[in-house]
C-alpha cells in the first residue's frame, strides 16, 4: 500500500455507510489518480441493478436495528412521520451533492469529484475572498466528520457484539426449541459486557491489519449474506401476533425526541456512497431515478421495521431489536449470525478512517519503519474505538451521539450550504437559499440538541429509560 501523504488528486472517496470493496481499487488511496476514474460506459461500469444493490448495501447497517427504540423515543405516530420527513430531506441532500459535483466537474473539466473535493471546490466559488483562500478546510472538515462517523460506527459495533454475545451466552442454559412466546428468562450471570468488548479487541485488531480491499471484499460478502438472512428472520417474527397498541403513546415526551433524531440520521447517513456509485453507473443519466428508488425502498424498510418492532415489543424495546428476540435456538442463531456480519463489517468501516489518517502519519517516518508505524497506528485506532465503547456501553446512546455529532453534518448541514456557495455567483433564487438555510438549521439544531441530550442521558440516565434503552438489560 502506498504511504505517501494524502493529496487532493490521490484521494479516493470511501465515505459510505457500508464500504463496498468490490468497486474500489485494491491498492487503496495511494494508487488513485484522476485518470483512474472512467465515466460509465468505459472500463468500470455498473448496470442500474448493480447500482441499486450497492446503494441498498451502503445504507443498511446497525442503525436499522435501533430504529424501533427510536420510534419509541418519538412516539408511535410522530416516529414514523419523522422518519419519512428525515428520509425525504436526506435524499434531497444527496441530490444536491450530486448536482453540485456535476456542476463543478463541468466547470473545472474534471472527470470526478468526491465529497471532500466537491466541498473544497465549491468554497472556491464563494464571493468571500477569505473563504476562497481557506477552501482547503472544506475537505478537512469533511474528512474530520467522516473519521468521526466511521470510528463511531466501529464503537457501535463493539457495543453491539458485546451485548448480543453476552445475552446469548447468559441465556444458553434456558434456550429452548419453542419460539412461539417471548418469555422472560432469568440469565446465568457471566462477565460484564465491557469484558466482552475487551475479548473482541485482539481479533478486531488482527482484522484491521488487512489492508487490501480485494481481501476485505470476501468478508463483505459474508457480512451481507449473514445480515440479509437475519433481517428476514427478524421480520418473520415481528409481524406475528402484534399486541394491542392502544397503550403506546402516539407522541413521546419531547425530551427523548433528540435521541430519536440522532438515531434516525445515523441510519440515513449514506450520503458518501452516492458520488462513487453515480460515477460508475453505465447510464449515469438514470442515476437520480435509481437514487430515489433505492432510498424509497430504504425509507419503507426503516419505517416498517421501526414501527413493527415498537408495536411488537412496546416499552420493553431495547437498543437493538435483536436483544428482544425470543430465547430459542432459532433466534439466538439470528443474533449470532447478525453479529458475525457486524464483526466482518468492522474492518470495512475501519478502512475508511484508516485510509485518511494513516498515510498522513506514515509519510513522516523513514521508509523502513513504514509498516511498523502503519500497524501500530491501526492498533491504536482500534483500541480507541474499544475504549470509547467501554466508556459508553449503551448502544442507543452511542448511535444517537454519533448520529447527532457527525452524521447530521455530513447528511444535512453541509450539502445545502454547498449548494448556496456553488451557485451564488451564477444566480440562485431566494426560495432556494431559504430552503437550504432551513435544512441546515434543522441539521444544526439536531446536532446541538441531540448531542446535548445524549450527553445528559449518558451522565445522568433518566429513571424511565435507564433500563429499557440500555442494551445491557435483559429480556
Curated annotation (Swiss-Prot):
Annotated tissue distribution: Highly expressed in small intestine, colon, kidney and brain.
The species this protein was found in: Mus musculus (Mouse)
Ranges of compositional bias, category Basic and acidic residues: 1-15
Membrane-traversing stretches: 51-71, 78-98, 141-161, 190-210, 215-235, 257-277, 289-309, 342-362, 372-392, 397-417, 439-459
Main subcellular location: membrane
Protein family: Belongs to the amino acid/polyamine transporter 2 family.
Name of this chain's protein: Proton-coupled amino acid transporter 1
All ranges on the Cytoplasmic side of the membrane: 1-50, 99-140, 211-214, 278-288, 363-371, 418-438
Keywords: Amino-acid transport, Cell membrane, Disulfide bond, Glycoprotein, Lysosome, Membrane, Symport, Transmembrane, Transmembrane helix, Transport
Superkingdom assignment: Eukaryota
Subcellular location: Cell membrane; Apical cell membrane; Lysosome membrane
Function of the protein: Electrogenic proton/amino acid symporter with selectivity for small apolar L-amino acids, their D-enantiomers and selected amino acid derivatives such as 4-aminobutanoate/GABA. May be involved in the efflux from the lysosomal compartment of neutral amino acids resulting from proteolysis. May play a role in specifying sites for exocytosis in neurons.
Record: glycosylation sites: 173, 182, 469
GO cellular component: a single term: lysosome
Cystine residue pairs: 179-328
GO terms assigned for molecular function: ABC-type taurine transporter transporter activity; amino acid:proton symporter activity; glycine transmembrane transporter activity; L-alanine transmembrane transporter activity; L-proline transmembrane transporter activity; proline:proton symporter activity
Catalytic function, reaction form: glycine(in) + H(+)(in) = glycine(out) + H(+)(out); L-alanine(in) + H(+)(in) = L-alanine(out) + H(+)(out); D-alanine(in) + H(+)(in) = D-alanine(out) + H(+)(out); L-proline(out) + H(+)(out) = L-proline(in) + H(+)(in)
Region (Disordered): 1-32
Lineage: Eukaryota, Metazoa, Chordata, Craniata, Vertebrata
